[in-house]
């Protein structure tokens, strides 16, 4: 059943050829069989999943629900899930049972989508490899020696290995797109504010954005349709009519102007990645798109700006984890200061502490102007690059990451080389624009993703381009042999 597309599953559920109970049990059996080696789930929720599947079958029998009713989903462990352990990959939240649902979870629950469990991730979404999780590294289903990308590595791995038909992720500097690229799946980071952040544990609030991780662009459109939309509980949620992501999927892309930045093909880009991306651009041209050269001259300023701004926001957001109200608490504190210091130093991992320190430093009185304010200026320059480029084209394409998935442990001792793994994805988060990763081939047996970037609120157009590309390629249908 796991080889069916979500569209086929949906049709079979409606036609009573399969039940949600049988479908959900099939995925739970696969998780039992394979997740021991992948470590893609932090928590599996079989009782909840089966209860929700029974309810979904009743909804379908009564003609209620929607296209995704009865289709199971896995949520990244950054989304609060009522009465389910929600850890954000950290010892700090190892015993935290969420008292409410995040908007993303609430929306899928209301539609009758059984929750299979919570997926593994870099601690507090800080990382590009899913190695910094308190629960151990997740492995890449294409090659168990490789990382799945991060921070949404668990969600990418469960889709690639067929341990869930649909999953959610979050993207602060590339955390949906880079793992999607490394695991050969489709993932979209919507425009900032399109998907509510209510109940999504905060890392860097002006960057964080939730989104779908699926096999195909069509499935991403369906899931985005469920989770997007205005939510008054999130002050940054966009108050505007929701786009129709699905009805334009089959539109012709003849005459579409596709921008290719010269800066994306400079030194440091893996040859195999470059050739796959050029082949994908040629496919778009065959579909009638017009290729135009554009420039993003400030691309290299994005990573330094991001690693001042995001840690600054994190140092503020993570101050709430103090050992007092919830989360990890050290044993036998001598006084309040000792409680704070030891709870935080014992509860947070090395990468999280590194970013809190960098952020606190950037915000300190003597350095605020030199670092934080300067980084804000760079952020505007990077955004303006995109605004100017989109005057000449409709979408921008390039690689998602400079290399295919690297080996587990390869970059863990060198934080800067790990940070540079996100050099193509981070600029988009600085600008707050939508972007997606679409499977586009393999380099040395490991998947490569094509990066599609659009102007604000152009998710429907990006999904349309991706869907058209997937009509003439089958990279998104490939599955690692051991999980077929």
From Swiss-Prot:
Family annotation (InterPro entries): Amidase, Amidase_CS, Amidase_dom, AS_sf, GatA
HAMAP family: GatA
EC number(s) on file: 6.3.5.7
Any one Gene Ontology cellular component term annotated for this protein: glutamyl-tRNA(Gln) amidotransferase complex
Summary of the function given for this chain in its UniProt record: Allows the formation of correctly charged Gln-tRNA(Gln) through the transamidation of misacylated Glu-tRNA(Gln) in organisms which lack glutaminyl-tRNA synthetase. The reaction takes place in the presence of glutamine and ATP through an activated gamma-phospho-Glu-tRNA(Gln).
Pfam families: Amidase
Taxonomic lineage from the root: Bacteria, Pseudomonadati, Pseudomonadota, Gammaproteobacteria, Thiotrichales
Gene Ontology MF: a single term: ATP binding
Family, per entry: Belongs to the amidase family. GatA subfamily.
Organism the protein comes from: Hydrogenovibrio crunogenus (strain DSM 25203 / XCL-2) (Thiomicrospira crunogena)
Catalytic activity, as annotated: L-glutamyl-tRNA(Gln) + L-glutamine + ATP + H2O = L-glutaminyl-tRNA(Gln) + L-glutamate + ADP + phosphate + H(+)
Subunit-level organization: Heterotrimer of A, B and C subunits.
Active site, UniProt feature: 76 (charge relay system), 151 (charge relay system), 175 (acyl-ester intermediate)
Recorded superkingdom: Bacteria
Gene3D superfamilies (alphabetical): Amidase signature (AS) domain (3.90.1300.10)
The protein, known as: Glutamyl-tRNA(Gln) amidotransferase subunit A
Alphabetic keyword roster: ATP-binding, Ligase, Nucleotide-binding, Protein biosynthesis
GO biological process: translation
